[in-house]
């Protein structure tokens, strides 16, 4: 027999960002409990609104599956006397397991012959287990932040008000905090707050909707999407697409109603990003554009209540937005009274980080780095890069960014343009913050790219230098994102640069701030970057062992490293690869980091030695040419031609000859071979 398990946790409004993860955790926890408890089930579904988390499991078995267990007992020598009669040890073991001595088995083990007993343990009914299981699940749901309330010794994202727990339509009785489980749920807080009985998921979903609660977030999202399309169509505009906001709003309401509002045309003189930030980030409004993508003085808000006349909702939201935009207009006018560059000195009074100094000091450091990068890579943009770096953080001292911190970079760009700065400088002020998230937009210009790399490497080296290193759970300075950003920018722009040199230069500029030895910091930073690069490449589907092999060989130049990874990954698909990898591994193992590659042909004792030497000389020039061109697949194919002569050497002579001079010469020959392919990858890391 199987039945449905239903659980609803009713709460105060839980933050929208908590709910998708909570749904996933709820499913994970019930699966783990049922599987660990040997209780069969079919499907698990979870739902959430701001005021409830819901779980439904179908096909739940009525009891635990039977389990055959084996218990070990005393050794045979202890269990039986010299005449073969059971001792107290054997009798006690049999009695404790509810069997006769004759039911005990003798088995040979590493320690000798021992007694064992196998028996079938009947499972407990599911109905008995659930009152223990469900409170454990509720307590185990992890939230980024949780709270306590009243004088209760429990924590949850928000205070809990009711619990519905049913198995096969019957209440699963348990207490949690000051609540007792039952079969009563509650409707929408304002539109239908009364209780209603629950008997099953199907009945619950229907009854909840009658009480103005759309429990399924997927359904709510679709309803909102449909309403947005309908409402925006009335004003002749187009919805500014925003799937992330749609996902969030779906968890902000239980019964959505889209409402169109507007604001004065005069506010359209403000930068579009500013208007969108105020509406989207602060009010969770959807923005409206015309056919050309230009913002219209309209917005759409999603209300949590429906009414015949939503004018009051519209007017209330317009009033709130008008106040926000009025503040923005004030800051816009005030900030423009002075030039952006005049704010640079004010950064001397802004602490970037207590041990790393002021924001002004940081700007001076990364300006030096950015200019040097420009000199190395694109000399013609040196002056633009220096100017952009100087202005990059000046908007932090504006009233607008103080009020709307999300607009850092955006306002710097806008104010720079108004001040008559070169458009590439203005663009770089914005772009040096890119990318703002994994897979996000990258700087589209060298000027912004240089400032971005310099700013980010200064942050990483500085934080590592004073012991502010990310942990598994904390990365307050977003150093992982910065590292990934640096690597992506380098790859996107194709810059050929040395990461060790960049890190060393950055640490040199930070010298008086460091609280750790610079050599240790450099090693930690480079390993941090290497791990980020490894994760980036494997996430793209490149084989783990190939990426590891390449990055273990050399990671100085990310562009070169990526070319080597792609070359080796392609070479791996060719028929000779496995045999070649085995041969190369053997070479690496026998030379063990040897450095002497001076070979004396006069010491050769067999044709196979001369054969390998000649083959090595024949391929070296072509190999080095392919490497210089970044044609690593061709380089690997070329060095692959050495497999046969290397194998012949291993078969024809004993490398570790008793003659020390001959042995050294053979090792030097193999070291010269290893030197070629080890510059591409460490083949000992390849799974072959």
Swiss-Prot record:
Keyword Ligase carried by entry: yes
GO cellular component: cytosol
Lineage top rank: taxon: Bacteria
Gene Ontology MF terms: ATP binding; glycine-tRNA ligase activity
One BP annotation, GO: glycyl-tRNA aminoacylation
Record field: catalytic activity: tRNA(Gly) + glycine + ATP = glycyl-tRNA(Gly) + AMP + diphosphate
Subcellular compartments: Cytoplasm
Oligomer status and interactors: Tetramer of two alpha and two beta subunits.
Family: Belongs to the class-II aminoacyl-tRNA synthetase family.
Protein name (record): Glycine--tRNA ligase beta subunit
């Amino acid at each position: 027999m199987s039945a449905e398990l239903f659980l609803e946790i009713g709460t105060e409004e839980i933050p929208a960002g908590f709910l998708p993860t909570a749904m996933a955790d709820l499913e994970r926890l019930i699966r783990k409990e049922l599987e660990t408890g040997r209780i069969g089930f079919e499907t698990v579904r979870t739902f959430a609104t701001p005021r409830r988390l819901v779980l439904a499991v179908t096909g739940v078995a009525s009891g635990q599956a039977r389990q055959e267990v084996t218990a070990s007992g005393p050794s045979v020598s202890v269990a039986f006397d010299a005449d073969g009669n059971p001792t107290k040890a054997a009798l006690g073991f049999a009695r404790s397991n509810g069997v006769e001595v004759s039911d005990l088995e003798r088995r040979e083990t590493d320690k000798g012959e021992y007694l064992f007993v196998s028996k079938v343990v009947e499972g407990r009914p599911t109905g008995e287990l659930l009152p223990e299981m469900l409170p454990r699940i509720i307590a185990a749901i992890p939230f980024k932040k949780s709270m306590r309330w009243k004088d209760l010794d429990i924590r949850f994202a928000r205070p809990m008000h009711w619990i519905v727990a049913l198995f096969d339509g019957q209440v699963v009785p348990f207490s949690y905090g000051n609540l007792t489980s039952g079969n009563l749920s509650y409707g929408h807080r304002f539109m239908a707050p009364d209780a209603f009985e629950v008997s099953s998921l199907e009945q619950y979903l229907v009854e909840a909707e009658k009480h103005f609660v759309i429990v399924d977030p997927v359904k709510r999202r679709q309803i909102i999407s449909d309403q947005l399309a309908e409402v925006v169509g009335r004003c002749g505009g187009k919805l500014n697409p925003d799937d992330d906001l749609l996902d969030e709003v779906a968890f902000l309401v239980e019964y959505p109603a889209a409402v169109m509002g507007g604001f004065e045309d005069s506010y359209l003189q403000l930068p579009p990003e500013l208007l969108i930030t105020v509406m989207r980030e602060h009010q969770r409004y959807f923005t409206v554009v015309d056919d050309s993508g230009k913002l219209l003085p309209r917005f759409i808000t999603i209300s949590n209540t429906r009414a015949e006349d939503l004018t009051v909702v519209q007017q209330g939201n317009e009033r709130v937005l008008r106040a926000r935009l009025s503040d923005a207009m004030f800051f816009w006018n005030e900030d423009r009274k002075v030039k952006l560059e005049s704010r640079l000195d004010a950064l001397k009074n802004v602490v970037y980080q207590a041990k790393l100094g002021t924001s002004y000091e940081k700007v001076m450091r990364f300006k030096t780095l950015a200019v040097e990068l420009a000199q190395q890579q694109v000399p013609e943009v040196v002056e633009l890069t220096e100017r952009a770096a100087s202005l990059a953080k000046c908007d932090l001292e504006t009233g607008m960014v103080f009020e709307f911190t999300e607009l850092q970079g955006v306002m710097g760009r806008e104010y720079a343009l108004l001040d008559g700065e070169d458009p590439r400088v203005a663009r770089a002020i914005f772009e040096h913050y890119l990318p703002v998230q994994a897979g996000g937009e990258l700087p589209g210009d060298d000027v912004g790219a240089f400032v971005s790399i310099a700013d980010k490497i200064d942050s990483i080296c500085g934080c590592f230098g004073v012991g502010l290193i990310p942990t598994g759970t904390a990365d307050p300075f977003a150093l992982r994102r910065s590292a990934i950003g640096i690597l992506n920018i380098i790859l996107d722009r194709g810059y050929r640069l040395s990461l060790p040199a960049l890190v060393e230069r950055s640490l040199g500029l930070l010298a008086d701030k460091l609280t750790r030895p610079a050599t240790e910091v450099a090693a930690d930073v480079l390993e941090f970057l290497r791990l980020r690069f490894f994760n980036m490449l494997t996430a793209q589907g490149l084989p783990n062992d190939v990426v590891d092999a390449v990055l273990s060989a050399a990671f100085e130049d990310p562009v070169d490293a990526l070319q080597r990874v792609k070359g080796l990954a392609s070479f791996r698909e060719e028929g000779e690869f496995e045999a070649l990898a085995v041969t190369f591994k053997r070479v690496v193992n026998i030379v063990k980091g040897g450095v002497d590659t001076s070979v004396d042909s006069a010491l050769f004792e067999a044709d196979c030695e001369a054969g390998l030497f000649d083959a090595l000389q024949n391929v070296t020039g072509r190999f080095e040419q392919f490497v210089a061109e970044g044609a690593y697949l061709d380089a690997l194919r070329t060095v692959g031609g050495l497999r046969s002569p290397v194998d012949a050497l291993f078969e024809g002579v004993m490398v570790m000859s008793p003659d020390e001079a001959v042995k050294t010469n053979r090792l030097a020959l193999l070291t010269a071979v290893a030197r070629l392919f080890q510059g591409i990858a460490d083949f000992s890391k390849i799974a072959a």
